[in-house]
């Protein structure tokens, strides 16, 4: 079990060589050794994962309300239990997502799968916009201020409020270290 403190990030290499970067406030459950014919972990939070390929042992990432099956790929998962929306952004390879409504959805590189309740949408994104936290920065490109403040609030575990009279969008980089 890995629990990442607020204001911190962590990196772990699993017994099969799979590498995981975990963001602040993330809980990651994984075995010391993978048994049987599958490799399975559970995440409540945000990770970037680079899965070591093994066609004979699929890799499964479970969250509170979706499952992700891969053979060898790299992708981001944002699935904090408290958030209404969960997302997956695929960097390389292919993954199959078991959505909460029972459907299985295959996504490709540069696809983002977003799920709220029993609804989901898949759209194209720039993957570079999603993983800056693992390198100690938060990068934003035309992002609503409310989204930026939500990420900062989660990272540092503090409540941030502002007057939302009109939407404000921002671009830039924030150093987390």
Language model region names:
Residues 1-177:
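A residue-level detector for the "anchor" residue at the start of short, highly conserved motifs
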């Amino acid at each position: 079990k890995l629990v990442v403190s607020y204001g911190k990030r962590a990196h772990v290499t699993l017994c099969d060589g799979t590498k995981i970067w975990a963001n602040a406030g993330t809980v990651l459950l994984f075995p010391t050794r993978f048994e049987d014919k599958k490799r399975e972990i559970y995440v409540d939070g945000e990770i970037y994962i680079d899965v070591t390929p093994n066609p004979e042992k699929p890799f499964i990432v479970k969250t509170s309300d979706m499952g992700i099956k891969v053979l060898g790929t790299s992708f981001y998962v944002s699935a904090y239990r408290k958030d209404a929306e969960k997302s997956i952004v695929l960097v390389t390879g292919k993954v199959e997502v078991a959505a909460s409504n029972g459907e299985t959805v295959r996504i490709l590189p540069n696809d983002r799968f977003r799920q709220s309740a029993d609804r989901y949408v898949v759209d194209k994104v720039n993957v570079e916009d999603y993983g800056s936290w693992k390198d100690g920065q938060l990068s934003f490109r035309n992002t609503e201020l409310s989204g930026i403040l939500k990420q900062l609030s989660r990272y540092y575990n503090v409540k941030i409020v502002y007057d939302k009279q009109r939407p404000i969008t921002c671009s830039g980089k924030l150093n987390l270290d």
